[in-house]
Amino acid sequence: MWSGLLPPGLNESDVELNSDDDTTLESSELNLQEGKEDGTFEKTEMVDIPTDGPSTEAEANINAYEECPSGIPLNMWNKFQELHKKHSEQKTSASRSEKKKRKRSRKGKLKNEEESHSEQSSSETQWKELTQYFGVNERFDPPVKRKKVEKSGLEKRIDQAVEEWNIEKAEELSNQLATRELGVKIAKAIACHNFVKAKKEAENSQVARKKKKLAWGFEAKKRWETKSNMGYM
């Protein structure tokens, strides 16, 4: 406890805090002296914890790397640093170019898929348009009884393979016959489609000509009517 008058600006609590600090300092000094005398004093290292984390470590590594080590000429060290810098720049540029290539390849794949899809849809529409003309002219063919059917050479070969029990050859020849018949059907359908298209175009052109003639005739009739009315006036 403090006895006596206190200086201005202080109170008893401040004096007590100061006395406590003095006692802690004295006790720490005594402990240090005792440790030195006993030989049991241990050194404690203060470890600074980095506040910025890995960025400060990277900066420290860069600074340590930029320092020229002992025993190496300065010009050689500068040349080595320039080469290292160029190598790192090449790595970054290569990584960027790889990313760009990946993006381009993805765009190219999407574009190819869209083109293939559009081509497939257009081919499907054309096929549907042709299939409606399959067998259109078959009604004009003569009946089967009156029609004299002659087998082709391929059909005769199929019959021969069946008689010889050569199933593989018969299947191969039958596939060829089916593709040939399909090709004939497609050719007939294309011819029919072209004929219908040409007929529609001719009809449309004829209708357009008639419309033009009607328009000119109406105007001439109107002029004639106006002239005749003027004659009566």
UniProtKB/Swiss-Prot annotation:
Organism: Bos taurus
Ranges of compositional bias, category Acidic residues: 13-24
Biased composition (Basic residues): 98-109
The keyword Coiled coil is annotated on this UniProt entry: yes
Taxon lineage: Eukaryota, Metazoa, Chordata, Craniata, Vertebrata
Record carries keyword ATP-binding: no
Coiled-coil spans in chain: 144-164
PANTHER family, sorted: PROTEIN FAM204A
Protein name: Protein FAM204A
Chain residue ranges for the region called Disordered: 1-57, 79-127
Keywords: Coiled coil
Stretches that traverse the bilayer: none
Start-end of Basic and acidic residues biased regions: 34-46
